[in-house]
Amino acid sequence: MVVILIIDNYDSFTHNLYQLAGEILRDEGMDEEIMVLRNDEARISDLRALDPEKIIISPGPGNPSRRSDFGVCMDVIGEFTDRPLLGVCLGHQGIFHAFGGRVDQGEPVHGKIVEVFHDGSELFRDVPNPFRATRYHSLVCRPEDTPADIEVTAVTSDEIIMAIKHREYPVYGLQFHPESAGTPSGRTVIRNFLRM
């Protein structure tokens, strides 16, 4: 049985997420299988049959509003709200968009390290506040258009949304890259997700 499914949005960072998750599982003594599928390799019915316990939607190029960029991921967000689901970068933007938020062009950042301020919620347990995180993105989730079902859980000093969670479901998003070497606390964030 696949316990953790990573959906790859054709991004090189997906391998880093896979490697980080695998290291954490080994360190925690968890014998869980991780499967990686590209966003156009499976239909939602195939994923239902896999019945993963946790899902990570990877970073990637493009816009979550375009199926050509986001593949099956929007369907996954709609279908699997009953289990822990984490979106990273494009995955985060897709979650925000799926629940009615506006995702727009922002200032492009590539490898920029910033301080992130968080609310101490479950993903940020044992994470310093603030902490340093690496950003690679050109789209941003607009704070003024945050859906009622979504809670902002982390921001930069200039109020750019860095993390969200659904108010009812175990659905989370991270704009920053926890798998980056420039995000020292990223391992703790991913560990907190995998422990859910």
UniProtKB/Swiss-Prot annotation:
Catalytic activity: chorismate + L-glutamine = anthranilate + pyruvate + L-glutamate + H(+)
Matching SUPFAM superfamilies: Class I glutamine amidotransferase-like
Catalytic residue positions: C89 (nucleophile), H177 (for gatase activity), E179 (for gatase activity)
GO molecular function, one term: anthranilate synthase activity
Keyword Transmembrane: no
Function: Part of a heterotetrameric complex that catalyzes the two-step biosynthesis of anthranilate, an intermediate in the biosynthesis of L-tryptophan. In the first step, the glutamine-binding beta subunit (TrpG) of anthranilate synthase (AS) provides the glutamine amidotransferase activity which generates ammonia as a substrate that, along with chorismate, is used in the second step, catalyzed by the large alpha subunit of AS (TrpE) to produce anthranilate. In the absence of TrpG, TrpE can synthesize anthranilate directly from chorismate and high concentrations of ammonia.
Name recorded for this polypeptide: Anthranilate synthase component 2
Organism of provenance: Methanothermobacter thermautotrophicus (strain ATCC 29096 / DSM 1053 / JCM 10044 / NBRC 100330 / Delta H) (Methanobacterium thermoautotrophicum)
